[in-house]
UniProtKB/Swiss-Prot annotation:
Location, primary (coarse class): cytoplasm
Name assigned to this protein: Lissencephaly-1 homolog
GO BP annotation list: brain morphogenesis; cell division; establishment of mitotic spindle orientation; germ cell development; microtubule organizing center organization; microtubule sliding; nuclear migration; retrograde axonal transport
Subcellular location: Cytoplasm, Cytoskeleton; Cytoplasm, Cytoskeleton, Microtubule organizing center, Centrosome
Entries under PROSITE patterns matching the protein: LISH, WD_REPEATS_1, WD_REPEATS_2, WD_REPEATS_REGION
Family recorded in the similarity comment: Belongs to the WD repeat LIS1/nudF family.
Record key words, sorted: Cell cycle, Cell division, Coiled coil, Cytoplasm, Cytoskeleton, Microtubule, Mitosis, Repeat, Transport, WD repeat
Gene expressing this chain: lis-1
Amino acid sequence: MSLSERQREEINRAVAEYLQNNGYSEAFNMLLKEASLSENDIKPLGGILEKKWTTVLRLQRKVNDLEAKLLESQQEINHGAPTRDKRQAADWIPRPPETQKLIGHRLPVTRVIFHPLWTIMASCSEDATIKVWDYETGQLEKTLKGHTDAVNDIAIDAAGKQLVSCSTDLTIKLWDFGQSYDCLKSLKGHEHTVSSVTFLPTGDFVLSASRDHTIKQWDISTGYCVFTFRGHNDWVRMIRISHDGTLFASGSLDQTVSVWSLPRKQRNWYFEIMSMRWSVSKPEGNSTHILFSGSRDRSIKAWNISTGEVIFTLSAHENWVRGLAFHPKGKYLVSVADDKMMRIWELSAQRCMKAIEAHEHFVSTVAFHQTNPYVITGSVDMSCKVWECR
């Protein structure tokens, strides 16, 4: 394809403007001479060369996305799977490529969560910050600073008005979320790294887990610890609460996973495991009390909370399983691991139905939006990614 005389003149003027605006005077004068242009010919074009360049890049990304979706659709047709238009919302799962890659943290991302109502998400990192993003546009909205060491976990209350964070600096912080983003309270009482934190469904209490072997319950109105759960003999790495708020699970480096009764303030049962690192999660809206745990032994286990027995085991990851998240309808489980993969499991068939290479380094965390078709992941590569479900 050859350019017309007018198109060549427009390109010459745009390049000349770029050279002039960026101080390349020698190249600018040489171009004027060789292209038979005068300075009067160089009218302000508003940085048209840069605009065309960025437009080409955006179009190329769109072309790549469309080609990936076309390839995926062709593969689904070849394998007899339903195409996107014929899939029900209950069958939507995350699919590549990612719609956004969020860059801003300076150290590994430790946790990602969605806001329950708005199109924003939050991420925390070993760089001691919490960042708030618009997950549809990829825009960084706010950076929360206050911790002096790695932020290990964050949670948002059901109303979406408050965020709680915990850190290696031994503190738990309560933040206003959505208005001022100010730190409202600092909760102190743990004697070592605070590794996990969660709101009770009522929003008036917070649970925290620590390397000091304890789990504490805090009244957020006063900032006081109202109860300390004891029973683990080593670092309590993670806690997660059931949707009705009556039970919570904890995973520890003492090689046990425990289930506790909040009303009775006691441990219902604990089960010894052969693994050292746990991610525990509880499917929403499930009348049967089932707990899923992911471990350093590369497996995911489903537990009967009433008996403490393993119901089944899912195996496919090739390294530590770091995070779990449930599909809103409870049909699928999403897992991420140090093998850099995100896997989608069909629970009824107990099989891995899709594997996605999610990041260039270990994938440390995952979250599934409860109403909108999005999944987010965070990684040791310091990035977060947004995945559309379809």
